[in-house]
Amino acid sequence: DRLRQVAQRTKATVGVLNQFGAHDELLFDGRVMVAEPNGSLTHLNAGWQPGMTVLDWDNKESHAEPDPLDELVHALACGISGYVRKTGHESVVLGLSGGLDSALVATLAAIALGPEAVHGICMPSRYSSSGSLDDARDLAARLGMVHLHEIGIEPIHEALRQSLQPALGEVAGVTDENLQARARGVLVMGLANAQGLLPLATGNKSELAVGYSTLYGDMCGALLPLGD
């Protein structure tokens, strides 16, 4: 829209080109666009990939603007692949809870790196439903993930509860819930360290805004794709 407005205001053909790639939270789409004084978009490359674009100035065919949702998916995938590559990694690992956040992060990682480069860990506790575990397995199958580990956290959770009982007595409520989340974080980091994987956190921006994420739990990771 801004490019169109500049072309209309200046009554001139205006072009813009952008670099491609990710630099931490800064994402560049590699777009080449040209707008005419009448507001039409006459040149638009595919974007989100390196390459060279040759413009035919005689071709005035109008192009529709990219779909915002497609752009968001491409941007997040670009951010993941760029960060993973620049930190010297090839594959990632994340916890799969059967919920939407981890499903979305796993999907974005599969788009960015290929499903064979995405390692998932299901970490059920006594409170986990069979449906959650089934959903995580189904997600991995649909994405074509070849690395899916199932590690129960009950022994770790119970050991932590027993360790805290002399100091706290009954371990319940938020403290008990967060122990489970942090036990999962330890397992994700353990697999990451042992196999040279980059851990992805699965919290989202809304949770961060209201303090709902668990420090060292679902915030545990080198990159938080849904953080912004």
Locations of the language-model features?
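CN hydrolase (nitrilase-like) catalytic-core segments centered on the catalytic cysteine
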Residues: 1-48
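Conserved helix-loop functional segments at active or binding sites
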Residues: 81-90, 111, 115-118, 162, ...
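Active-site adenylate/phosphate-handling loop in enzymes that bind or generate adenylated species
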Residues: 1, 113, 143, 167-228
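Phosphate/ATP-binding catalytic cores across multiple sugar-kinase/actin-like superfamilies
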Residues: 68-93, 185-191
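ATP-dependent adenylation/pyrophosphate-handling site
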Residues: 90-96, 100-137
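General beta-strand structural signal in soluble alpha/beta enzymes
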Residues: 14-17, 43, 94, 150, ...
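A conserved beta-strand->alpha-helix junction
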Residues: 47-56, 117-122, 126-175, 181, ...
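Catalytic P-loop NTP-binding/switch module of NTPases
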Residues: 41-42, 49-75
